[in-house]
């Protein structure tokens, strides 16, 4: 018997290197999002043909079979409030993401951060991203997507920009460009991991 599709689903994924973040992530998530389904992908076993974060597009494709609208969150994202309203901002046929302002500033190009990705259905760019991570020489999933959408017109076709508060990265604090009401604080990198451990020990 076929399972009925959910209308909304939040997903994340981790492997043995990052699963220490999971308890902290879930504690914050469920504090603010009771009733909003969460699916966790085990990246130690899921999509064995891919490594690490390159599994992310595969997880999103799998989730598109489970729900009409999906939000991916990295496990180093601190969920500070309900994110249910984020589903209302999703645009069909696009990946909905926040601009990575620090990377854009430092590189001179427009980057979008792949730590938070929202979408409806199964956008064409999602399958293209999955195919590209299988053959890429780029160092991460975000770099792969950026290389695919570097051209302004291509980016306009496939990426829809979400408000800054839905993915405020650690370097935003350093650059002093944080939004007023942060919904998702993304503690990126080694220093971000240190901050997460500090919060877990409080």
Q: Model segments located where?
A:
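GT-A fold catalytic core of metal-dependent nucleotide-sugar glycosyltransferases
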Residues: 52-111, 118-119
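Extracellular/periplasmic catalytic domains that process cell-envelope and extracellular macromolecules
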Residues: 3-5, 90, 108-111, 175-180, ...
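Catalytic core and acceptor-binding pocket of nucleotide-sugar-dependent glycosyltransferases
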Residues: 119-202
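Non-transmembrane alpha-helical segments in soluble domains
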Residues: 26, 30, 84-87, 130, ...
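A residue-level signal for conserved active-site and pocket-lining positions in enzyme catalytic cores
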Residues: 10, 29, 60, 76, ...
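Residues that flank catalytic or metal-binding motifs in active/ligand-binding sites
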Residues: 6, 56, 73, 112-115, ...
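N-terminal anchoring/stem segment of glycosyltransferases
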Residues: 1-55, 65-66, 153, 188-196, ...
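Lumenal/extracellular "mature" regions of secretory-pathway glycan-modifying transferases
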Residues: 24, 30, 36-56, 95-113, ...
């Amino acid at each position: 018997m076929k399972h009925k599709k959910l209308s909304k689903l939040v997903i994340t994924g981790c492997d043995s290197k990052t699963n220490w973040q999971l308890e902290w992530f879930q504690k914050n998530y469920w504090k603010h999002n009771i009733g909003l389904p969460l699916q966790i992908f085990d990246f130690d076993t899921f999509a064995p043909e891919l490594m690490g974060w390159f599994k992310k597009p595969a997880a999103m494709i799998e989730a598109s079979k489970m729900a009409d609208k999906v939000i991916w969150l990295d496990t180093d994202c601190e969920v500070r409030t309900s994110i249910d309203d984020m589903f209302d901002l999703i645009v069909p046929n696009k990946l909905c993401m926040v601009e990575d302002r620090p990377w854009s500033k430092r590189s001179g190009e427009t980057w979008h951060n792949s730590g938070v990705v929202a979408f409806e259905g199964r956008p064409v760019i999602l399958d293209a991203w999955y195919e590209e991570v299988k053959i890429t020489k780029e160092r991460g999933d975000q770099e792969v997507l950026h290389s695919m959408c570097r051209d302004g017109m291509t980016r306009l076709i496939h990426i829809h920009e979400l408000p800054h508060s839905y993915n405020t990265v650690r370097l935003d604090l350093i650059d002093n460009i944080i939004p007023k009401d942060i919904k998702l604080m993304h503690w990126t990198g080694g220093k971000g991991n240190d901050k997460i451990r500090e919060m877990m020990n409080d």
